[in-house]
């Protein structure tokens, strides 16, 4: 066997650590395999207390402090980092309105619509393509930007009072202009409009 082949398959703790460090201590089975860690080796690290199993296919280096958005990070990693936090979840991340989402809203690419997925408990899926220009980052996870978030919430049936409050806050902060809020205006038209 070639020495180069051995070097490629040897576990690389630094690589795994660097990957996890960029994701608040979390990593996936695939990311571990890319760093040379088999599931058997992960089990040994779990037994040794260096790694914890979070959910199917997702692990955490135990010496990282727990953060405030762990359920969001694990939902994003579950999507193989293809998803974007959206709707009420993104609204909450942006600090708009008073919504306390009971679900993690995650938008997956449109071509994932027909995939049969084992969706984690507490995650609500949406399907649409979200370009990079319409994303904001909150630590290690992406969420839809303010304009896209308000549009998604307007089309997704957020209560008129919450939608109006969030849109007014975004306008006051200068995060959006009135021209960015066509979907919000349309959703609020039967309820007196944005100024109602």
Kindly give the residue locations of the regions a language model identified.
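Short beta-edge/loop segments at beta->alpha junctions of small alpha/beta modules
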Residues: 1-85, 111-120, 128-132, 138, ...
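Phosphate-handling catalytic interfaces
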Residues: 2-3, 88-196
């Amino acid at each position: 066997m070639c020495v180069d082949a051995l070097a490629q398959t040897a576990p690389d703790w630094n690589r795994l650590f660097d990957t996890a460090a960029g994701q608040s201590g979390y990593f996936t089975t695939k990311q571990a395999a890319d760093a040379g860690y088999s599931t058997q080796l992960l089990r040994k690290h779990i037994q040794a207390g260096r790694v914890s199993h979070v959910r199917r296919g997702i692990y955490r280096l135990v010496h990282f402090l727990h953060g405030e958005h762990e359920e969001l990070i694990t939902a994003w990693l579950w999507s193989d980092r293809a998803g974007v936090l959206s709707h009420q979840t993104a609204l909450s991340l942006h600090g708009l309105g008073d919504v306390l989402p009971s679900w993690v809203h995650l938008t997956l690419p449109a071509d994932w619509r027909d995939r049969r997925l084992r969706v984690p408990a507490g995650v609500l899926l949406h399907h649409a393509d979200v370009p990079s220009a319409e994303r904001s980052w909150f630590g290690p996870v992406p969420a839809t930007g303010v304009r896209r978030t308000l549009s998604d919430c307007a089309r997704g049936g957020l209560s008129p009072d919450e939608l109006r409050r969030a849109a007014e806050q975004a306008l006051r902060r200068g995060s959006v202009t009135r021209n960015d809020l066509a979907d919000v205006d349309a959703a609020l038209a039967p309820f007196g409009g944005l100024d109602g």
